[in-house]
Protein backbone atom coordinates (compact mmCIF):
# COMPACT_ATOMS: atom_id res chain seq x y z
CA UNK A 1 0.00 0.00 0.00
CA UNK A 2 1.57 3.26 -1.09
CA UNK A 3 1.69 6.07 1.45
CA UNK A 4 3.95 8.54 -0.33
CA UNK A 5 2.58 12.08 -0.31
CA UNK A 6 4.23 15.44 -0.72
CA UNK A 7 5.21 17.24 2.46
CA UNK A 8 3.08 20.40 2.75
CA UNK A 9 4.79 23.70 2.07
CA UNK A 10 7.18 24.69 4.83
CA UNK A 11 6.42 27.67 7.03
CA UNK A 12 8.36 30.91 7.03
CA UNK A 13 9.95 30.08 10.39
CA UNK A 14 11.71 26.94 9.20
CA UNK A 15 12.22 24.60 6.30
CA UNK A 16 9.84 21.97 7.67
CA UNK A 17 6.23 22.06 8.95
CA UNK A 18 6.10 22.31 12.74
CA UNK A 19 4.01 19.73 14.56
CA UNK A 20 2.96 20.12 18.20
CA UNK A 21 2.76 16.70 19.85
CA UNK A 22 0.40 17.10 22.82
CA UNK A 23 0.07 14.53 25.60
CA UNK A 24 -0.96 13.96 29.22
CA UNK A 25 -4.28 15.51 30.14
CA UNK A 26 -6.88 15.40 32.87
CA UNK A 27 -8.31 11.91 32.36
CA UNK A 28 -7.57 8.66 34.16
CA UNK A 29 -5.64 7.66 31.03
CA UNK A 30 -3.00 10.37 31.61
CA UNK A 31 -0.14 7.90 32.10
CA UNK A 32 -1.09 5.92 29.00
CA UNK A 33 -0.93 9.14 26.99
CA UNK A 34 2.66 9.67 28.17
CA UNK A 35 3.65 6.18 27.02
CA UNK A 36 1.99 6.81 23.66
CA UNK A 37 3.78 10.16 23.29
CA UNK A 38 7.16 8.63 24.08
CA UNK A 39 6.65 6.12 21.27
CA UNK A 40 5.62 8.79 18.76
CA UNK A 41 8.47 11.15 19.70
CA UNK A 42 10.96 8.33 19.24
CA UNK A 43 9.64 7.40 15.81
CA UNK A 44 8.57 10.67 14.17
CA UNK A 45 10.68 11.64 11.16
CA UNK A 46 12.69 14.70 12.27
CA UNK A 47 13.99 15.14 8.71
CA UNK A 48 10.43 15.79 7.58
CA UNK A 49 8.86 17.54 10.57
CA UNK A 50 9.93 20.06 13.18
CA UNK A 51 8.50 18.91 16.51
CA UNK A 52 7.54 20.75 19.67
CA UNK A 53 6.31 18.57 22.52
CA UNK A 54 3.65 19.88 24.90
CA UNK A 55 2.54 18.24 28.13
CA UNK A 56 -0.76 18.78 29.91
CA UNK A 57 -0.81 18.17 33.65
CA UNK A 58 -3.62 16.34 35.44
CA UNK A 59 -5.06 19.72 36.47
CA UNK A 60 -4.97 21.06 32.91
CA UNK A 61 -1.79 23.19 32.80
CA UNK A 62 -0.08 23.28 29.37
CA UNK A 63 3.72 23.50 29.22
CA UNK A 64 6.74 22.54 27.15
CA UNK A 65 8.01 19.05 27.96
CA UNK A 66 10.96 17.81 25.93
CA UNK A 67 11.38 14.24 24.79
CA UNK A 68 14.35 13.94 27.13
CA UNK A 69 12.28 15.08 30.11
CA UNK A 70 9.51 12.64 29.22
CA UNK A 71 11.96 9.76 28.78
CA UNK A 72 13.58 10.45 32.16
CA UNK A 73 10.19 10.65 33.88
CA UNK A 74 8.98 7.33 32.46
CA UNK A 75 12.31 5.61 33.10
CA UNK A 76 11.94 6.53 36.76
CA UNK A 77 8.20 5.79 37.02
CA UNK A 78 6.53 3.88 34.15
CA UNK A 79 2.99 5.05 35.07
CA UNK A 80 3.99 8.61 35.95
CA UNK A 81 2.10 11.88 36.01
CA UNK A 82 3.61 15.01 34.49
CA UNK A 83 4.96 17.68 36.85
CA UNK A 84 4.17 21.19 35.63
CA UNK A 85 7.09 22.73 33.72
CA UNK A 86 8.23 26.35 33.99
CA UNK A 87 7.61 27.14 30.32
CA UNK A 88 3.83 27.33 30.21
CA UNK A 89 2.14 27.52 26.81
CA UNK A 90 -1.21 28.71 25.50
CA UNK A 91 -3.06 29.16 22.22
CA UNK A 92 -4.35 32.60 21.18
CA UNK A 93 -7.67 31.14 19.86
CA UNK A 94 -7.66 33.74 17.12
CA UNK A 95 -8.14 33.08 13.42
CA UNK A 96 -4.92 33.57 11.50
CA UNK A 97 -2.68 33.38 14.58
CA UNK A 98 -1.23 29.86 14.57
CA UNK A 99 1.27 30.44 17.35
CA UNK A 100 1.94 28.48 20.47
CA UNK A 101 2.55 31.22 23.04
CA UNK A 102 5.36 30.32 25.44
CA UNK A 103 5.39 31.91 28.91
CA UNK A 104 8.35 31.72 31.27
CA UNK A 105 6.90 31.17 34.76
CA UNK A 106 10.19 30.70 36.59
CA UNK A 107 10.90 33.10 39.46
CA UNK A 108 12.73 35.65 37.29
CA UNK A 109 11.08 34.83 33.99
CA UNK A 110 9.44 37.29 31.65
CA UNK A 111 5.63 37.18 31.49
CA UNK A 112 5.81 36.21 27.81
CA UNK A 113 9.01 35.09 26.19
CA UNK A 114 8.07 34.18 22.63
CA UNK A 115 5.65 32.53 20.25
CA UNK A 116 6.18 29.44 18.11
CA UNK A 117 4.38 28.99 14.81
CA UNK A 118 2.54 25.67 14.63
CA UNK A 119 1.33 24.01 11.42
CA UNK A 120 -0.61 21.15 13.00
CA UNK A 121 -1.26 19.45 16.32
CA UNK A 122 -0.90 15.73 16.97
CA UNK A 123 -3.08 15.13 20.06
CA UNK A 124 -2.10 11.92 21.85
CA UNK A 125 -4.56 12.22 24.71
CA UNK A 126 -6.91 9.41 25.68
CA UNK A 127 -10.25 9.65 27.46
CA UNK A 128 -12.24 12.71 28.60
CA UNK A 129 -10.77 16.16 27.90
CA UNK A 130 -8.62 14.66 25.16
CA UNK A 131 -10.39 12.43 22.66
CA UNK A 132 -13.99 13.39 23.50
CA UNK A 133 -14.29 16.48 21.29
CA UNK A 134 -13.29 19.07 23.90
CA UNK A 135 -9.67 19.45 22.77
CA UNK A 136 -10.76 19.17 19.15
CA UNK A 137 -13.19 22.05 19.65
CA UNK A 138 -10.44 24.21 21.12
CA UNK A 139 -8.17 23.47 18.14
CA UNK A 140 -11.01 24.41 15.78
CA UNK A 141 -11.35 27.72 17.63
CA UNK A 142 -7.59 28.21 17.29
CA UNK A 143 -7.84 27.56 13.54
CA UNK A 144 -5.22 24.79 13.86
CA UNK A 145 -5.20 21.58 11.81
CA UNK A 146 -4.95 18.45 13.94
CA UNK A 147 -4.59 14.71 13.60
CA UNK A 148 -7.67 12.57 14.04
CA UNK A 149 -11.41 12.91 14.24
CA UNK A 150 -13.30 16.17 14.52
CA UNK A 151 -15.53 17.40 17.33
CA UNK A 152 -18.68 15.37 16.63
CA UNK A 153 -16.93 12.11 15.78
CA UNK A 154 -14.71 12.39 18.84
CA UNK A 155 -17.69 13.01 21.12
CA UNK A 156 -19.66 10.09 19.67
CA UNK A 157 -16.60 7.85 19.80
CA UNK A 158 -16.21 8.60 23.52
CA UNK A 159 -19.75 7.51 24.40
CA UNK A 160 -20.50 3.79 24.11
CA UNK A 161 -24.24 4.51 24.03
CA UNK A 162 -24.25 7.07 21.23
CA UNK A 163 -21.76 5.13 19.10
CA UNK A 164 -24.10 2.13 19.19
CA UNK A 165 -26.99 4.34 18.07
CA UNK A 166 -24.85 5.59 15.17
CA UNK A 167 -23.90 2.02 14.22
CA UNK A 168 -27.51 0.88 14.28
CA UNK A 169 -28.58 3.86 12.16
CA UNK A 170 -25.94 2.83 9.60
CA UNK A 171 -27.31 -0.72 9.46
CA UNK A 172 -24.47 -2.35 11.41
CA UNK A 173 -25.30 -5.16 13.81
CA UNK A 174 -24.59 -4.58 17.51
CA UNK A 175 -25.05 -6.94 20.43
CA UNK A 176 -27.86 -6.59 23.01
CA UNK A 177 -27.28 -3.86 25.59
CA UNK A 178 -29.00 -1.49 27.98
CA UNK A 179 -28.09 1.99 29.18
CA UNK A 180 -28.10 2.96 32.87
CA UNK A 181 -28.39 6.69 33.53
CA UNK A 182 -27.52 8.18 36.90
CA UNK A 183 -31.08 9.26 37.71
CA UNK A 184 -32.49 5.87 36.71
CA UNK A 185 -30.10 3.99 39.00
CA UNK A 186 -30.80 6.32 41.92
CA UNK A 187 -34.61 6.27 41.52
CA UNK A 188 -35.32 2.80 40.10
CA UNK A 189 -32.53 0.33 40.84
CA UNK A 190 -34.97 -2.58 40.69
CA UNK A 191 -35.93 -1.61 37.14
CA UNK A 192 -32.25 -1.50 36.19
CA UNK A 193 -31.67 -4.96 37.64
CA UNK A 194 -34.66 -6.30 35.71
CA UNK A 195 -33.47 -4.73 32.44
CA UNK A 196 -30.02 -6.25 32.91
CA UNK A 197 -31.49 -9.66 33.76
CA UNK A 198 -33.38 -9.62 30.45
CA UNK A 199 -30.02 -9.53 28.65
CA UNK A 200 -29.03 -12.82 30.30
CA UNK A 201 -25.78 -13.49 32.11
CA UNK A 202 -22.89 -13.00 31.77
CA UNK A 203 -22.97 -9.27 31.11
CA UNK A 204 -20.26 -6.62 31.04
CA UNK A 205 -20.86 -3.43 33.01
CA UNK A 206 -18.96 -0.49 31.54
CA UNK A 207 -18.64 3.25 32.11
CA UNK A 208 -20.16 4.83 29.01
CA UNK A 209 -17.35 7.37 28.63
CA UNK A 210 -14.10 5.81 29.79
CA UNK A 211 -11.38 3.97 27.93
CA UNK A 212 -8.57 1.46 28.43
CA UNK A 213 -11.07 -0.91 30.10
CA UNK A 214 -11.18 1.22 33.26
CA UNK A 215 -14.16 0.34 35.45
CA UNK A 216 -15.30 -2.67 33.42
CA UNK A 217 -16.53 -5.77 35.25
CA UNK A 218 -17.78 -9.12 34.00
CA UNK A 219 -20.92 -10.12 35.90
CA UNK A 220 -21.82 -13.81 35.91
CA UNK A 221 -24.80 -13.73 38.28
CA UNK A 222 -27.29 -11.16 39.63
CA UNK A 223 -25.64 -10.98 43.06
CA UNK A 224 -22.54 -9.40 41.46
CA UNK A 225 -24.38 -6.64 39.60
CA UNK A 226 -24.59 -3.90 42.23
CA UNK A 227 -20.86 -4.06 43.00
CA UNK A 228 -20.05 -3.90 39.28
CA UNK A 229 -22.29 -0.85 38.87
CA UNK A 230 -20.57 0.82 41.83
CA UNK A 231 -17.16 0.17 40.24
CA UNK A 232 -18.24 1.60 36.89
CA UNK A 233 -19.80 4.66 38.54
CA UNK A 234 -16.40 5.59 39.95
CA UNK A 235 -15.49 6.49 36.36
CA UNK A 236 -18.79 7.69 34.88
CA UNK A 237 -22.36 8.10 36.11
CA UNK A 238 -23.68 6.92 32.75
CA UNK A 239 -23.20 3.20 32.15
CA UNK A 240 -23.66 0.68 29.36
CA UNK A 241 -24.39 -2.95 30.19
CA UNK A 242 -23.68 -5.35 27.34
CA UNK A 243 -24.73 -8.96 26.96
CA UNK A 244 -21.81 -11.34 26.78
CA UNK A 245 -21.17 -12.45 23.20
CA UNK A 246 -19.87 -15.94 22.51
CA UNK A 247 -17.46 -14.99 19.76
CA UNK A 248 -13.93 -14.15 18.80
CA UNK A 249 -12.64 -10.62 19.47
CA UNK A 250 -11.44 -9.06 16.22
CA UNK A 251 -10.10 -5.56 15.61
CA UNK A 252 -9.61 -3.55 12.43
CA UNK A 253 -7.69 -0.29 11.98
CA UNK A 254 -8.97 2.51 9.73
CA UNK A 255 -7.09 5.37 8.03
CA UNK A 256 -8.85 8.26 6.37
CA UNK A 257 -8.55 8.74 2.62
CA UNK A 258 -6.82 11.59 0.81
CA UNK A 259 -9.15 14.08 -0.85
CA UNK A 260 -12.14 12.17 -2.20
CA UNK A 261 -10.49 8.78 -1.72
CA UNK A 262 -12.25 6.20 0.42
CA UNK A 263 -11.03 5.46 3.94
CA UNK A 264 -8.80 2.39 4.22
CA UNK A 265 -9.08 -0.61 6.53
CA UNK A 266 -6.15 -2.73 7.65
CA UNK A 267 -6.07 -6.48 7.77
CA UNK A 268 -8.08 -7.51 10.85
CA UNK A 269 -6.31 -8.82 13.93
CA UNK A 270 -7.49 -11.20 16.62
CA UNK A 271 -6.80 -10.60 20.30
CA UNK A 272 -6.01 -13.58 22.48
CA UNK A 273 -5.92 -12.62 26.16
CA UNK A 274 -3.66 -14.52 28.57
CA UNK A 275 -4.26 -14.73 32.32
CA UNK A 276 -7.10 -12.17 32.38
CA UNK A 277 -10.89 -12.52 32.43
CA UNK A 278 -11.13 -9.70 29.89
CA UNK A 279 -8.89 -7.47 27.79
CA UNK A 280 -8.19 -5.07 30.65
CA UNK A 281 -5.72 -2.27 31.39
CA UNK A 282 -2.88 -4.58 32.46
CA UNK A 283 -3.26 -6.80 29.41
CA UNK A 284 -3.27 -3.75 27.11
CA UNK A 285 -0.48 -1.62 28.51
CA UNK A 286 1.48 -3.20 31.36
CA UNK A 287 2.14 -6.85 30.59
CA UNK A 288 3.92 -7.43 27.30
CA UNK A 289 2.57 -11.00 27.30
CA UNK A 290 -0.92 -10.05 28.55
CA UNK A 291 -2.35 -10.50 25.08
CA UNK A 292 -1.21 -11.59 21.66
CA UNK A 293 -2.38 -10.37 18.27
CA UNK A 294 -2.73 -12.60 15.25
CA UNK A 295 -2.78 -10.50 12.08
CA UNK A 296 -4.29 -11.29 9.73
CA UNK A 297 -6.84 -13.08 11.86
CA UNK A 298 -7.37 -16.70 10.89
CA UNK A 299 -10.77 -16.24 9.30
CA UNK A 300 -12.37 -17.07 5.94
CA UNK A 301 -11.64 -14.48 3.27
CA UNK A 302 -15.28 -13.43 3.00
CA UNK A 303 -15.42 -12.72 6.76
CA UNK A 304 -12.22 -10.65 6.52
CA UNK A 305 -13.80 -8.69 3.67
CA UNK A 306 -16.92 -8.07 5.79
CA UNK A 307 -14.84 -6.87 8.74
CA UNK A 308 -12.86 -4.42 6.62
CA UNK A 309 -16.00 -3.12 4.93
CA UNK A 310 -17.86 -2.73 8.23
CA UNK A 311 -14.89 -0.96 9.84
CA UNK A 312 -15.05 1.70 7.12
CA UNK A 313 -18.85 1.86 7.46
CA UNK A 314 -18.50 2.42 11.21
CA UNK A 315 -15.87 5.12 10.58
CA UNK A 316 -18.29 6.95 8.30
CA UNK A 317 -21.24 6.33 10.65
CA UNK A 318 -19.62 8.61 13.24
CA UNK A 319 -18.22 11.01 10.60
CA UNK A 320 -14.69 9.81 11.29
CA UNK A 321 -11.51 11.48 10.05
CA UNK A 322 -7.87 10.53 10.29
CA UNK A 323 -7.91 7.29 12.23
CA UNK A 324 -9.94 4.89 14.29
CA UNK A 325 -9.88 1.34 15.55
CA UNK A 326 -13.04 -0.75 15.33
CA UNK A 327 -13.67 -3.69 17.65
CA UNK A 328 -15.86 -6.60 16.56
CA UNK A 329 -17.15 -9.98 17.62
CA UNK A 330 -17.28 -12.83 15.10
CA UNK A 331 -19.54 -15.69 16.17
CA UNK A 332 -19.23 -19.38 15.31
CA UNK A 333 -21.84 -18.96 12.55
CA UNK A 334 -19.79 -16.05 11.10
CA UNK A 335 -22.02 -13.20 12.22
CA UNK A 336 -20.06 -9.95 12.50
CA UNK A 337 -21.16 -7.64 15.34
CA UNK A 338 -19.50 -4.30 15.96
CA UNK A 339 -18.81 -3.50 19.59
CA UNK A 340 -16.94 -0.17 19.71
CA UNK A 341 -15.01 2.44 17.78
CA UNK A 342 -11.99 4.18 19.29
CA UNK A 343 -11.13 7.50 17.65
CA UNK A 344 -7.74 7.80 19.40
CA UNK A 345 -6.58 4.20 19.74
CA UNK A 346 -3.54 3.18 21.71
CA UNK A 347 -0.33 4.00 19.88
CA UNK A 348 2.30 2.28 22.03
CA UNK A 349 4.70 -0.37 20.69
CA UNK A 350 2.34 -3.14 21.86
CA UNK A 351 -0.87 -1.41 20.74
CA UNK A 352 -3.05 -3.11 18.19
CA UNK A 353 -3.63 -0.15 15.85
CA UNK A 354 -0.02 0.33 14.65
CA UNK A 355 0.60 -3.42 14.70
CA UNK A 356 -2.33 -4.06 12.35
CA UNK A 357 -1.06 -1.41 9.95
CA UNK A 358 2.46 -2.84 10.14
CA UNK A 359 1.01 -6.21 9.12
CA UNK A 360 -0.79 -4.41 6.29
CA UNK A 361 2.37 -2.77 4.94
CA UNK A 362 2.62 0.59 6.73
CA UNK A 363 5.33 0.77 9.39
CA UNK A 364 5.12 2.92 12.52
CA UNK A 365 7.08 5.94 11.27
CA UNK A 366 5.25 5.94 7.93
CA UNK A 367 1.94 5.74 9.79
CA UNK A 368 2.82 8.86 11.77
CA UNK A 369 3.74 10.64 8.51
CA UNK A 370 0.45 9.59 6.95
CA UNK A 371 -1.65 10.85 9.86
CA UNK A 372 0.11 14.23 9.92
CA UNK A 373 -0.23 14.58 6.15
CA UNK A 374 -3.96 13.86 6.37
CA UNK A 375 -4.29 16.53 9.06
CA UNK A 376 -2.46 19.16 6.99
CA UNK A 377 -4.58 18.39 3.93
CA UNK A 378 -7.83 18.87 5.82
CA UNK A 379 -9.37 22.31 6.37
CA UNK A 380 -10.51 23.38 9.82
CA UNK A 381 -14.08 24.54 10.38
CA UNK A 382 -17.18 23.05 8.79
CA UNK A 383 -16.33 20.36 6.24
From Swiss-Prot:
It is an enzyme of class 6 (ligase). Its cofactor is Mg(2+); Mn(2+). Residues 164-373 form the ATP-grasp domain. GO terms for cellular component: cytosol. Keywords: ATP-binding, Cell shape, Cell wall biogenesis/degradation, Cytoplasm, Ligase, Magnesium, Manganese, Metal-binding, Nucleotide-binding, Peptidoglycan synthesis. GO terms for molecular function: ATP binding; D-alanine-D-alanine ligase activity; metal ion binding. It is found in: Cytoplasm. Its EC number is 6.3.2.4. ATP binds at residues 196-251. It comes from the Bacteria. Mg(2+) 2 binds at residues 340, 342. GO terms for biological process: cell wall organization; peptidoglycan biosynthetic process; regulation of cell shape. Its main location: cytoplasm. Belongs to the D-alanine--D-alanine ligase family. This is D-alanine--D-alanine ligase. The gene is ddl.
